[in-house]
């Protein structure tokens, strides 16, 4: 496909309107301050911030741990099934408006069960929103259960046991929270059990952790997809492996800058990842906290990196479909939609028009 006819000034519209998938979104991280206050009022929870603006002002993170502290505090307003539904439904509506056609959504059950919230309350609310999204929005979505790596292996096994009666409502498991002091090998046995159960496997690695964490996630956890993974470029052998085996990375540019993984978007390595042949994707991570949903991650990144153009936009969107955990026929259908989107652009003589 020839992308030379697409001028840079048209990129913003193309990035916002092209069909795409989101593969790295923590649903608790989509909890906007307005909804936090609404749920706090509904559930009679006293927040430490008297106004929405003061809560927003508290989103001044210096590293991953300082973010996680307020992230878990915000999740405390989630008490009932309706709360989890409302949170997920708000995200799905936003995703639909941004031309996301498929989302694979992380959720952290241990954050909630530790507060005495039953697992079924969490997953039933999320699942109800996903089913409504399919019916009313035509948006495909699925759930991935994430284990909190700062907790013990025993806690992870307990979370898995809680989840098994609801096995039909999630497609896989992941590993999130702080990498420091919590290497992948801590959860080797948990992931082995999940693999036996036929669950899809992903893991956060190489965000604040080293390239070795990525290798260990692949070798020990048998992860099929790496979340973040930006430190892979520190290891040329790992890069070659990622390219050869087509192991996708779910990269989150605005998150990386907010958490000081990179000093600025102009210093981000997403362009280098693509140039190396890695199946990188762009995602929002925790959009309510990091200043942008999926389209903002695309547009801000492309604005900051002049080397990225229409070819990279197409490749990132295509990678997002190819890296998703759906059957090949569905993937091929989405890729045809993407091809038609760019073909439609060319047929209109270089003028961007929506399909």
Curated annotation (Swiss-Prot):
Zn(2+) binds at residues 24, 26, 204, 285. The keyword Hydrolase applies. InterPro entries: A_deaminase_dom (IPR001365), ADE (IPR028892), Ado/ade_deaminase (IPR006330), Metal_Hydrolase (IPR032466). Its EC number is 3.5.4.2. It catalyses: adenine + H2O + H(+) = hypoxanthine + NH4(+). One of its GO terms (molecular function) is adenine deaminase activity. It is an enzyme of class 3 (hydrolase). GO terms for biological process: adenine catabolic process; hypoxanthine salvage; nucleotide metabolic process. Binds 1 zinc ion per subunit. Its cofactor is Zn(2+). The keyword Hydrolase applies. Substrate binds at residue 286. This is Adenine deaminase. It comes from Geotalea uraniireducens (strain Rf4) (Geobacter uraniireducens).
């Amino acid at each position: 496909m020839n992308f030379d006819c697409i001028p840079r000034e048209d990129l913003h519209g193309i990035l916002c309107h092209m069909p795409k998938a989101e593969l790295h979104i923590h649903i608790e991280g989509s909890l906007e301050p307005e909804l936090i206050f609404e749920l706090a009022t509904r559930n009679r929870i006293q927040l430490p911030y008297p106004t929405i603006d003061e809560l927003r002002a508290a989103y001044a993170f210096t590293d991953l741990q300082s973010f996680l502290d307020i992230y878990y505090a915000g999740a405390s307003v989630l008490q009932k099934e309706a709360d989890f539904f409302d949170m997920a439904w708000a995200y799905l509506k936003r995703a639909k408006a941004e031309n996301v056609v498929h989302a694979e959504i992380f959720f952290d059950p241990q954050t909630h069960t530790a507060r005495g919230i039953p697992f079924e309350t969490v997953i039933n609310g999320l699942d109800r929103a996903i089913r409504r999204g399919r019916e009313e929005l035509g948006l495909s979505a699925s759930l991935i259960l994430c284990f909190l790596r700062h907790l013990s292996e025993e806690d992870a096994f307990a979370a898995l046991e809680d989840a098994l009666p609801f096995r039909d409502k999630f497609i896989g498991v992941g590993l999130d929270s702080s990498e420091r002091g919590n290497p992948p090998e801590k959860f080797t046995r948990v992931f082995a059990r999940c693999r036996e159960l036929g669950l899809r496997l992903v893991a956060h690695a190489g965000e604040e952790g080293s390239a070795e964490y990525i290798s260990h996630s692949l070798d020990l956890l048998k992860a099929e997809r790496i979340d973040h993974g930006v430190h892979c470029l520190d290891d040329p052998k790992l890069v070659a492996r990622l390219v050869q085996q087509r192991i996708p990375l779910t990269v989150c540019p605005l998150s990386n800058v907010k958490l000081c993984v990179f000093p600025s978007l102009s210093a981000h390595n997403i362009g280098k990842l693509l140039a190396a042949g890695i199946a990188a994707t762009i995602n929002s991570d925790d959009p309510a906290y990091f200043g942008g949903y999926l389209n903002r991650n695309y547009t801000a990144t492309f604005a900051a990196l002049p080397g990225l153009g229409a070819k990279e936009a197409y490749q990132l969107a295509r990678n997002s479909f190819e890296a998703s955990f759906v059957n090949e026929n569905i993937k091929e259908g989405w890729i045809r939609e993407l091809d038609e989107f760019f073909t439609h652009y060319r047929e209109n003589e270089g003028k961007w028009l929506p399909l």
